[in-house]
Amino acid sequence: MKTQRDSPSLGRWSLVLLLLGLVMPLAIVAQVLSYQEAVLRAIDGINQRSSDANLYRLLDLDPRPTMDGDPDTPKPVSFTVKETVCPRTTQQSPEDCDFKKDGLVKRCMGTVTLNQARDSFDISCDKDNRRFALPGNFFRKAREKIGKEFKRIVQRIKDFLQHLVPRTEA
């Protein structure tokens, strides 16, 4: 009498289920984005919703904060984007576009999720008001500070030497 254990189809089904069990975790892992990939997707969304003429591209990504392992939990992000030469209507990736000389720089902050299936982000960007010093300004200011400090040191030396000179009593 033949039992189900001896059935070749049961062995095949067991093998199929085993393989599915091994493949499914890999499929889930493949849906988790890296921190930078999630930020790049958020920038794509910013470009789609922007009313500006040109695309924006990642200029600087702040270090990744310590995060929990749940890809569905919103993760805090902060980064800087800069205007490119590519028009917003182009189908070109912003990463393939050069930065526009004197292009608008925006500071962006918010949250992203790393779960590719959810693909959610909440980002707001404002014009970056930080001044980027030109080398000429840097050297001029450094020279002024050094000059002031040098004058202060010379004055302190003069004051010290005046106190060393013996005073004559009249």
From Swiss-Prot:
Disulfide bonds: 86-97, 108-125
Keyword field: Antibiotic, Antimicrobial, Cleavage on pair of basic residues, Disulfide bond, Immunity, Innate immunity, Secreted, Signal
InterPro entries reported in the protein's UniProt record: Cathelicidin-like, Cathelicidin_CS, Cathlecidin_C, Cystatin_sf
Subcellular location: Secreted; Vesicle
Classification via PROSITE patterns: CATHELICIDINS_1, CATHELICIDINS_2
Pfam families, alphabetized: CAP18_C, Cathelicidins
Posttranslational mods: Proteolytically cleaved by proteinase PRTN3 into antibacterial peptide LL-37. Proteolytically cleaved by cathepsin CTSG and neutrophil elastase ELANE.
Any one biological process term the GO annotation gives: defense response to Gram-positive bacterium
Superkingdom of the source species: Eukaryota
Alphabetical list of Gene3D superfamilies matching this protein: 3.10.450.10
Region (Active core): 150-162
Cellular component terms per the entry's GO annotation: extracellular space; vesicle
The keyword Secreted appears for this protein: yes
GO molecular function annotations of the record: lipopolysaccharide binding
Cleaved propeptide residues: 31-131
Family: Belongs to the cathelicidin family.
Function according to Swiss-Prot or TrEMBL: Antimicrobial protein that is an integral component of the innate immune system. Binds to bacterial lipopolysaccharides (LPS). Acts via neutrophil N-formyl peptide receptors to enhance the release of CXCL2. Postsecretory processing generates multiple cathelicidin antimicrobial peptides with various lengths which act as a topical antimicrobial defense in sweat on skin. The unprocessed precursor form, cathelicidin antimicrobial peptide, inhibits the growth of Gram-negative E.coli and E.aerogenes with efficiencies comparable to that of the mature peptide LL-37 (in vitro).
UniProt-recorded name of the protein: Cathelicidin antimicrobial peptide
Source organism: Nomascus concolor
